């Protein structure tokens, strides 16, 4: 108990320590994660600041040469932009100059940057000062939502196309080029201040915000409705202006900005549009080509690729929501167009003006046409970054490289601009041959001393030494402590032991008193009929008077009577005339029919059916007359009528026909009468005119048999019938024939089951079990037993066949008839009697089934039993060893008798000739003991111990 408590306490402490360690480690991990997150946030903010200020640092670090190259590249890019959308036919130079004079002060921004003469890319403009609380963000770091799902209104005076990009019409227009007399803003190479403080050239009237399109005062156009100043207010499509279609490049000016392109347009090989000479992207102006340089076509085309131009891109023109490119005209933002239905949302997508519509008049146009001299207000908050732009066009092809010289020879010419050509390092050459071995080096320092090896395994134990002398006895130890008091407990009984050896059988007990008389057995098998008794004395002579003629005696001879059936003759003269008319042709009705003889089979033995006929086809004599085929039911009825028998029927005896339903007549039996004692009750039954079926054993009596047929045995004869009763009442045509009831056994009554006619294959003939003899009592044929005693028969009579006793007919055990012998398989409801119909050839099979080969346990038990029997016999003979003799053992009398005979020794192979029922290589224990112990041992020991 103490150890278990100690182990439990240690386990609890260990679990507590593990839990504390897990909590501490979790806290440390969470702290590290929080520190890492805070450092990542700081680094991200720092990265944003660096990314937002990187362009300013790059601008300050540019050299004049790099600035010139940037100007050239930017000018070439701007040459692909469309012409100014604000130069219309109604716009005059005077209006532009007047507007420029009034908006000179507004041309410059507060930061001092001139948006008019800006030649750099839009991203190179200096940013406006932002409030310190507004964080800087780089473009593209926070992508805005698409224009169709954006919650913010787009900038004033602009819209987005399907790619989330502002069209070219809403961008800052390219300002007209200045005359050549005007100096360039970046002419001085070392003047960095001129980048932000250029000389103010003649200004034109452009708005302050470069992203807001310029809207000069034009009296012929209405002004677009303005939005509130808050650019971050949510956009509502209900108050959205008429959105113009997106602008597509539709031509422009050459590099000077004033003259149309001098070089011919290329790649204009497609099908022209309906509104112009060709597609708008085919009219993109190009700069004059540089000598020795190939022109690169614009990227927004779908022209076939040029195999000679390896730098030509294949990016298609961004289509509109309609799926095709439209040829547009210069867009006037002051013109009002109705909202179209072609876009996915009202106010977005390509909107076309409806033909025949007029711009609406606005009364505020007169007020808004006045010049605005109000000072510019403070800069608004920084807007959301725009969507990322399309990738830029590829740069021009580089200059042609210098001609290289031979290996080891410098190039003949030197270009001061390019300088020396820096060639990359080539691949390593092949490995050269190995050199000669060098001088051996000096000896190294001695190493440390090694670790000692491990000890070897202990050797095998040696041989035991000599036994020494015993030592002197030690001193007695101290008495031990008294033990604990014992506890009383009840032990569980152990398992039962193995059965002991069987003891010597005890002596026979005194004979018991006779038991009660047993009940009578069931009636046995119906035996053959007995012999006829002696004839009785003759009766008194009858009245000597002539008999009166019968009903039918006046017109035809009477037919022969039948021994099976008897019908009441109830035909009148009218019926007879009908029968005469219905007779077939060629049939002599007046001629008396000769009865057809019938061949019957005479047998001297009884078959298994105990009275049934042999199923054989009847053999007719060739001279027998065959009746014509049946024509109607009347003719058949005539055939059925048979004459009465000549002699009276014998007294009624129970025949086998009354025991089996298949032996009944072919007609359905009437239901049993209410009064079972009266067996002569007649029941009217309508006769079915159908010829009776013949049986397989003998021909059915149908009117063609006579006196000359062979006489059958008495037990084969049909059931006797009463005398026919003829009705002498008035004849009636509708009165049916009546059938005489058959007298049945008074105890059995009528069998309600239908008779079964066996028309299938005939039964196999089996030998009879009894011979026909004169004695009324029969003795069973002695035969050897096929079952051990006490098995397969009632226990009340175990060996009834051994004494040769006879059985009466009433005491014979009933055996149900079976079609075929199925070995020893007994039916469920069959009584437990020995099957005496088993043939001799099944003897070996029965032996194998009931006497199997014993196992080892049985052999051991039998051997012990044999030894005990020998010991008992030796004691009875005065201790002498029994001698094996072939003398059969005599039955031992009870010890209470006066004379005692010596019992001969038991032989191992002893079997009485009268008691031997089988032969087996391994005899059972019941065969090695006297007969007086056989049944007792067999019943109590064999079945209870070995079989269970």
UniProtKB/Swiss-Prot annotation:
Residue segments, region Disordered: 65-934
Pfam families: Col_cuticle_N, Collagen
Region feature Triple-helical region, mapped onto this chain: 377-408, 426-488, 491-552
GO biological process terms on file: collagen and cuticulin-based cuticle development; cuticle development involved in collagen and cuticulin-based cuticle molting cycle
Signal sequence interval, chain numbering: 1-25
Entry PTM: May be processed for secretion by bli-4.
GO molecular function: structural constituent of collagen and cuticulin-based cuticle
Subcellular location: Nucleus
Record flagged with keyword Cell membrane: no
Compositionally biased region (Low complexity): 88-105, 180-189, 293-314, 454-464
Keywords, ordered alphabetically: Collagen, Cuticle, Disulfide bond, Nucleus, Repeat, Signal
Start-end of Pro residues biased regions: 376-390
Main location, first listed in the record: nucleus
One GO cellular component, as annotated: collagen trimer
Keyword Disulfide bond found: yes
Biased composition (Basic and acidic residues): 507-519, 563-597, 630-645, 679-698, 706-787, 794-808, 821-847, 856-878
Gene ablation phenotype (knockout): RNAi-mediated knockdown causes accumulations of fluid, known as blistering, in the cuticle. Hypodermal or cuticular rupture, typically in the anterior body region. Defects in cuticle integrity.
Family, similarity comment: Belongs to the cuticular collagen family.
Subunit structure: Collagen polypeptide chains are complexed within the cuticle by disulfide bonds and other types of covalent cross-links.
Protein task: Probable cuticular collagen-like protein. Nematode cuticles are composed largely of collagen-like proteins. The cuticle functions both as an exoskeleton and as a barrier to protect the worm from its environment. Acts downstream of the Wnt signaling pathway; perhaps in the formation of the adult cuticle. Required for proper strut formation within the unique medial layer of the adult cuticle.
Protein name from the UniProt record: Cuticle collagen bli-1
Gene encoding the protein: bli-1
